[in-house]
Curated annotation (Swiss-Prot):
Gene knockout outcome: Disruption of the gene does not change the piliation compared with the parent cells.
Protein name: Probable minor pilin MMP0709
Taxonomy of the source species: Archaea, Methanobacteriati, Methanobacteriota, Methanomada group, Methanococci
Signal peptide range: none
Native source species: Methanococcus maripaludis (strain DSM 14266 / JCM 13030 / NBRC 101832 / S2 / LL)
Record's subcellular location: Secreted; Cell surface; Fimbrium
Main location: secreted
Keywords: Fimbrium, Secreted
Record has Secreted as a keyword: yes
InterPro entries xrefs: Class3_signal_pept_motif (IPR007166)
Induction: Expressed under standard laboratory conditions at 35 degrees Celsius.
Pfam families assigned to the protein according to its UniProt record, in alphabetical order: Class_IIIsignal
Keyword RNA-binding (UniProt): no
Motif (QXSXEXXXL): 6-14
Record comment regarding domains: Contains an amino terminal motif QXSXEXXXL, which is part of a class III signal sequence.
Length: 198
C-alpha cells in the first residue's frame, strides 16, 4: 500500500476513533492552508436531508450539496467575498432552495425558485445540515493538527466520514466570538469537531 493510501486510512481511523470516544477535537486550519488563501473546496454531496429546524422539511433521499468559499469575513461589512452557498434539492419533485450568507448583515438567505427570499439571522445556534462525509482539500505543503498532533496532508485532502454505526452526522456554520470569524462544526452524538478558519 502506498504511503498516501496508508495515511488516508490512518487519518480516517483516527477521526472515527475520536468520534466514538466522545472527546472534543479542535482542528485549526489557517486560511493559508487553502489554495488562494480561501476554503476553495469544502463540499458535501450525498443523499440526505436538512433537519426540520433548519426550515426545510426533512425528506428522504433529498440531495444536499454544500460549497463553501471564503468565510473568514465580517458579515456586518458591505463585502462581496462571502461565497458560502448550499443547495437543497428535493429529488421527489425537483424543487430547489439555495442558501447563502448576506454580504451586509449576519443573515442566512434562503432563495426559493419562485423568487421568494427569506433571511434568517445567523448566530451561535445556526441549525445543522446532515452529511455523510465532508472533504477539505488543502495545499500539500501545509499540515493540520488533531489533538495537538500534526497530521501530514500528503494526500491533499482531509476526509471525514460518518462514525461507525451511523449513516450520517450533522454539521453547522455559526459565527465565532471574534469579528469576521466563522466556524464549521461537525456534530454527532454530542461530539464536536471544530474547524477554526482564522
Amino acid at each position: 500500500m502506498s504511503n498516501r493510501g496508508q495515511l488516508s486510512i490512518e487519518m480516517v481511523i483516527l477521526v472515527l476513533a475520536v468520534l466514538v470516544s466522545g472527546s472534543y477535537v479542535a482542528l485549526d486550519l489557517s486560511k493559508g492552508a487553502f489554495e488562494t488563501t480561501a476554503v476553495n473546496d469544502v463540499q458535501e454531496s450525498s443523499y440526505c436531508g436538512f433537519t426540520p429546524d433548519f426550515g426545510a422539511t426533512s425528506i428522504d433521499k433529498a440531495l444536499v450539496k454544500l460549497t463553501t468559499g471564503i468565510i473568514n469575513i465580517n458579515p456586518n461589512a458591505a463585502v462581496t467575498n462571502n461565497e458560502f452557498n448550499a443547495t437543497y434539492t428535493n429529488t421527489t419533485d425537483n424543487t430547489v432552495v439555495t442558501y447563502s450568507l448576506d454580504n451586509v448583515h449576519p443573515n442566512l438567505i434562503k432563495n426559493y425558485a419562485d423568487g421568494t427570499i427569506v433571511k434568517v439571522p445567523l448566530n451561535e445556534t445556526w441549525k445543522n445540515f446532515t452529511a455523510s462525509n465532508i472533504i477539505l482539500r488543502m495545499k500539500s505543503d501545509y499540515v493540520c493538527t488533531i489533538n495537538g498532533e500534526n497530521v501530514s496532508m500528503e494526500s491533499n485532502c482531509f476526509e471525514i466520514t460518518a462514525p461507525l454505526g451511523s449513516d450520517s452526522f450533522d454539521f453547522q456554520m455559526s459565527a465565532g466570538t471574534g469579528a469576521g470569524q466563522y466556524y464549521l462544526r461537525l456534530v454527532d452524538q454530542e461530539v464536536t469537531i471544530e474547524f477554526s478558519l482564522e
